């Protein structure tokens, strides 16, 4: 089982913990990332998380998200997971947008308590979803993402909703 990096509120590494243990209670702030894939038509790829996921299975979310390994730079993890989840090889450095901290409980199953780095990748490579990670996915015009979230709020992950709201308010100019 993989380990994730425990961090303090300033994103300083303070240790490592088993990935499952990190999500069982809300005590373990750990480093994570989310990435939005945007194509040349200004469409954003949105994925439905696999039903086998521990937290928020079957929910709609950003293009992909994960955790860097303890010995891995976050940008490298963004590139690695694009290939593992979506079959997309990224040859350019992903564009960092911002980072934020959040804590959310999923039913009686567990928590996300992350210091999340948000990235964007521009590519026209079509995704080939790994069924262990992704149940479905589609591209949506960048101008329609907020309406999609609003109309499907109860089926979207909490970090997707938080990230897109922040992107609209503070980072939208970096997406086009």
Swiss-Prot record:
Designated name of the protein: Isopentenyl-diphosphate Delta-isomerase 1
Catalytic activity, reaction form: isopentenyl diphosphate = dimethylallyl diphosphate
PROSITE patterns: NUDIX
Location in or out of the cell: Cytoplasm
Function in brief: Catalyzes the 1,3-allylic rearrangement of the homoallylic substrate isopentenyl (IPP) to its highly electrophilic allylic isomer, dimethylallyl diphosphate (DMAPP).
Leading EC class: isomerase
Binding site for Mg(2+): 65, 85
Keyword Transcription in annotation: no
Taxonomic lineage from the root: Bacteria, Pseudomonadati, Pseudomonadota, Gammaproteobacteria, Enterobacterales
Cystine pairs: none
Pfam family, one: NUDIX
Details of cofactor binding: Binds 1 Mg(2+) ion per subunit. The magnesium ion binds only when substrate is bound. Binds 1 Mn(2+) ion per subunit.
Active site residues of this protein: 65, 114
Gene Ontology BP annotations: dimethylallyl diphosphate biosynthetic process; isopentenyl diphosphate biosynthetic process
Requisite cofactors: Mg(2+); Mn(2+)
């Amino acid at each position: 089982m993989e380990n994730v990096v425990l961090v303090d509120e300033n994103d300083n590494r303070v240790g490592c913990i088993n990935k499952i243990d990190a999500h069982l209670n809300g005590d373990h702030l750990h480093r994570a990332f989310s990435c939005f894939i945007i194509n040349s038509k200004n469409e954003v790829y949105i994925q439905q998380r696999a039903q086998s996921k521990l937290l928020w299975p079957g929910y709609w979310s950003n293009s992909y998200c994960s955790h860097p390994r303890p010995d891995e730079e976050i940008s490298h993890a963004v590139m690695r997971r694009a290939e593992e989840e979506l079959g997309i090889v990224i040859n350019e450095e992903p564009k960092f947008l911002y980072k934020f901290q959040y804590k959310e409980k999923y039913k009686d199953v567990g928590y996300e308590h992350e210091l999340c780095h948000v990235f964007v990748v521009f590519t026209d490579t079509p995704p080939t979803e790994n069924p262990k990670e992704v149940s479905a996915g589609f591209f949506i015009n960048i101008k329609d993402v907020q309406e999609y979230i609003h109309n499907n709020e109860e089926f979207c992950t909490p970090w997707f909703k938080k990230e897109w709201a922040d992107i609209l308010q503070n980072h939208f100019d970096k997406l086009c």
